[in-house]
Amino acid sequence: MACSGFQSHGAWLELTSRTWPCTALFSLLFIPVFSKGMHVAQPAVVLANSRGVASFVCEYGSAGKAAEVRVTVLRRAGSQMTEVCAATYTVEDELTFLDDSTCTGTSTENKVNLTIQGLRAVDTGLYICKVELLYPPPYYVGMGNGTQIYVIDPEPCPDSDFLLWILAAVSSGLFFYSFLITAVSLSKMLKKRSPLTTGVYVKMPPTEPECEKQFQPYFIPIN
């Protein structure tokens, strides 16, 4: 009995010695996630422009200086969170979103300037900036309160062919109106000139006076 108890105790010690490195690694990786928080600030409201582009700044603060950072943009719709885009970059290099052309950004010190493109009215919602400081340890993670992005779809432009038809109709109407006014004006001018002359020259005989005086010669006799 003593021998069997000693064997079981030895097996437990051997199992503990084998699993201790894994337990220590687990503790080093996951305990800092919950113990090292980070504040992330972002604007409360942003209005996208007419082309569906919205820009906002994510500013994070931490005690250490990170060399490798990961930025993730999340969209909250009700109780669900969906990832819009994400990128991992080093402080020395430029922030680039390789897998998604929806987002672009630049980084300066502890600020990340994010731009989201191709937004429509249905994309209006709360966009949350998540920042992770990956290297060097310890691991920091923080999420902002979110930026409410409002998107207004621009009114559709009218068809260019339709505009051409309208322009042609208006031009034709103006031309017909000017032609009608010109014709009426010429007609009135001709009517005014008709009582003055018929346009045909007729040679008329000279007229004699109705009453022509007759003069008798008057002679004075000379003796």
UniProtKB/Swiss-Prot annotation:
Modified residues (Phosphotyrosine): Y201
Location(s), subcellular: Cell membrane
Superkingdom assignment: Eukaryota
Signal peptide coordinates: 1-35
Membrane topology, as annotated: Single-pass type I membrane protein
GO CC entries: external side of plasma membrane; plasma membrane
Gene3D superfamilies: Immunoglobulins (2.60.40.10)
Cytoplasmic compartment segments: 183-223
Gene Ontology biological-process annotations: adaptive immune response; B cell receptor signaling pathway; negative regulation of regulatory T cell differentiation; regulation of T cell proliferation; T cell receptor signaling pathway
Record function comment: Inhibitory receptor acting as a major negative regulator of T-cell responses. The affinity of CTLA4 for its natural B7 family ligands, CD80 and CD86, is considerably stronger than the affinity of their cognate stimulatory coreceptor CD28.
Stated name of the protein: Cytotoxic T-lymphocyte protein 4
